[in-house]
Structure formats: structure tokens, C-alpha cells
Amino acid sequence: MRSVVTGVGAYLPSKVVTNDDLAKFVDTSDEWIVERTGIRQRHQAADDQPVSDLAFEAAKEALAAAGKTAADVDLIIVATTTGDLTFPATATIVQRKLGAPVGVAFDVQAVCSGFVYAMSVADGFVARGHSKCALVIGAEAMTRLMDWSDRGTCVLFGDGAGAIVLEPGEGEGTTDDRGMLGFALRADGTKQDLLYVDGGPSTTGTVGKLRMLGNQVFKHAVVNISEAIHAAAGKAGVAVADVDWFIPHQANQRILQGVAHRCGIDEEKVISTVAIHANTSAASIPLAFAHGIKDGRIKKGDLLLLEAMGGGLTWGACVVRL
């Protein structure tokens, strides 16, 4: 039994913030941001728009694409760092908003790696017969964590949500099967100080602001993600060169290019949305996934490679045939 992606959805808040907009109140410029990150704009959620609203919209689109309704959903996993409340889980709030029946619903927090981690967990439920229709959602309002005086971080992030529907599918046990083929998940807590938020309910009692040592993160990202990519491909029984599309976490263009180059992935195979979405943390992979489907590049039967790295540090990769 494989867990098969049968629907993909995305949602972006209507407000677009350009680099020129940021340059009005922080010491930066469009040229400076583009040269270092490849980012040209990002979306920002409205003040009265919680993350569950973003997740809800992406989930509706994914369900429609899969030909399913909320009544079919028996598992919801939301990957987020910026949930509505300390508790309950944002997944339960999404469950209520969708009108889904009583089932399993919880959050996964691995920051930018969250969606890959959540996919792995959902795969375990579906492939073992514990779920017949799973929603996996990456949703973030990262702009809520920004220190708007820190030009090294505030220019990097945006808000949004993406979702996939996973359903069980029979296969022949080969790499031609549709579905999840291989995962590699990693974490190294000794690197916590490279990327974190300086707040929390049991420490400061505040939400906190995002802090990052960008150059150190870049160094670890390229090396560690590349290792995870080869590990996931090995578990899937495929070569990296066989991949049709590479859907990386949209951290910045330099990391995307660095990882692709190190792994020998042709630039034409890279789905990049960082210029228009910026870094949306756990939402970035499903947003890019949906973008590639909507523009006609990604098609049923294609072999996809997904990867991410986030605070913790956490990182991981997944090989899936659509």
C-alpha cells in the first residue's frame, strides 16, 4: 500500500509587499534583496487573518482537486510555527472550519522542514491503513515573527499556505508506483542558535522575534540537504538524475542553486517560487508544488524530489511519484 497524492492546493493572502515597500522603512533596496536572495515580493496576511484561515483555503482547494469533500477527511496534519493559539492545535481549528467529521488532527512543528516531516507522519497513517483521506497542510504567517528593524531577516519571509490530499493506492512495489517512495529526516539540536525565535510560553511568556545567522545556515543547508537528498533517493531506489522535478524549500535562490548544483540537478528541473513568495517556512514546498501543477510543468506520473531545512536545525527530503 502506498500513500498517493491525489490533490494539491494553495492560498496566498491578497496583500503583496514588494522590496520597494520594505525600503520605505528599513535600510535596504530592491537591488540589495534580489542580489542576495532572489526575492522580489512576498504576501502578508491581514491583521485579522489567522493561520487557520490560510490553511482552510488551501485545504479546500486541495480537496476539490482530489474530488473529495470535508466529509471524507479522517486525518489532518498542519505543519506550522505560527499557529492561531498556543493550544489547541491549529489542525483542530481547521477541522472545525472545514466541517470535517471526528477524526485525527494535530500539528507538527519543525519550522521550514515541517511539511516534509508532516508528509512522513501522514504516510505512516495512510500506508498502514489508518487513514483513507489525509490532509497535510503547511501554513505560516511568518511576518508576525519579524523584527522589522533587522534587514537581514525581515526581507526574507512571507505568509501563505499549501496543502495536499493523501489517499491509499495499490502498487507493484516498484519505483513506477505512484505515491511516497522514500524519506530521509534529520535534526541536530546543537545548531539551535543558528536559527530560532527568542520567545516562548515557558521561557519569556512572549511570542518573540526571529533571529538568524544567515551565513552559517547557508553553509549547513547546502551540505546537509544534499546528504538527505541522496539518502531519500537511495531509500526510494532511484537516482537523483532520474527525478523529473525538484521542489525545494524556498529559503533563498542561492541555497536552491547551491543544493541543485551539489546534487547535479539541472536548473531547468527546479521549481522556484522564492521570487514571488519569499520564504514561507512550512508552506513553501506545497505552495511551489501547487505552482508547478498550475503552470503545467508537473504532471501525473512525474517523479518529484522535495527537500527542506529549518530551525533546530531540522532538515529532510522526500521522493514521491505523483
Curated annotation (Swiss-Prot):
This protein's UniProt keywords: Acyltransferase, Cytoplasm, Fatty acid biosynthesis, Fatty acid metabolism, Lipid biosynthesis, Lipid metabolism, Multifunctional enzyme, Transferase
Catalytic activity: malonyl-[ACP] + acetyl-CoA + H(+) = 3-oxobutanoyl-[ACP] + CO2 + CoA
Recorded GO MF terms: 3-oxoacyl-[acyl-carrier-protein] synthase activity; beta-ketoacyl-acyl-carrier-protein synthase III activity
Root EC class: transferase
One of the GO BP terms on file: fatty acid biosynthetic process
Subcellular location: Cytoplasm
Pfam families (UniProt xref): ACP_syn_III (PF08545), ACP_syn_III_C (PF08541)
Primary localization class, coarse: cytoplasm
Span list, region ACP-binding: 250-254
GO cellular component: cytoplasm
Keyword Lipid biosynthesis appears in the UniProt entry: yes
Active site annotation, chain numbering: 112, 249, 279
Listed pathway(s): Lipid metabolism; fatty acid biosynthesis
Enzyme Commission number(s) of this protein: 2.3.1.180
Domain of life the protein comes from: Bacteria
Region forming the signal peptide: none
Complex and partners: Homodimer.
Protein name: Beta-ketoacyl-[acyl-carrier-protein] synthase III
Organism of this sequence: Caulobacter vibrioides (strain ATCC 19089 / CIP 103742 / CB 15)
Taxonomic placement: Bacteria, Pseudomonadati, Pseudomonadota, Alphaproteobacteria, Caulobacterales
Gene: fabH
